[in-house]
From Swiss-Prot:
NCBIfam families: PRK14420.1. Keywords: Hydrolase. Its EC number is 3.6.1.7. SUPFAM superfamilies: Acylphosphatase/BLUF domain-like (SSF54975). InterPro entries: Acylphosphatase, Acylphosphatase-like_dom, Acylphosphatase-like_dom_sf, Acylphosphatase_CS. Signal peptide: none annotated. This is Acylphosphatase. It catalyses: an acyl phosphate + H2O = a carboxylate + phosphate + H(+). It comes from Bacillus licheniformis (strain ATCC 14580 / DSM 13 / JCM 2505 / CCUG 7422 / NBRC 12200 / NCIMB 9375 / NCTC 10341 / NRRL NRS-1264 / Gibson 46). The active site is at R18, N36.
Length: 90
């Protein structure tokens, strides 16, 4: 199991991107959360198997139909939080 901290930049707020991220996380059996940040980016914490996280990242980089992803920063964190499911945080 791994945990990634992901920051997504572009047109990713107000376009259903967090819902898209949650659906992709569920599809890949990941746990964690996604939230909007004050600077216009979206932050994601995702835990799961390495291959599942890689597939999830591919989907995130592609984006949802109404989003336009311009940059994705990924950092593997040292800790696991043991999330039970994947949530949208407000």
């Amino acid at each position: 199991m791994l945990q990634y901290r992901i920051i997504v930049d572009g047109r990713v707020q107000g376009v259903g991107f967090r819902y898209f991220v949650q659906m992709e996380a569920d599809k890949h059996k990941l746990t964690g959360w996604v939230r909007n940040r004050d600077d216009g980016t979206v932050e994601i914490r995702a835990e799961g198997l390495e291959e599942s996280l890689k597939q999830f990242l591919k989907a995130i980089q592609k984006g949802s139909p109404f989003s336009k992803v311009t940059d994705v920063k990924v950092e593997e964190t040292k800790e696991l939080d043991g999330f039970q499911k994947f949530n949208i945080s407000y």
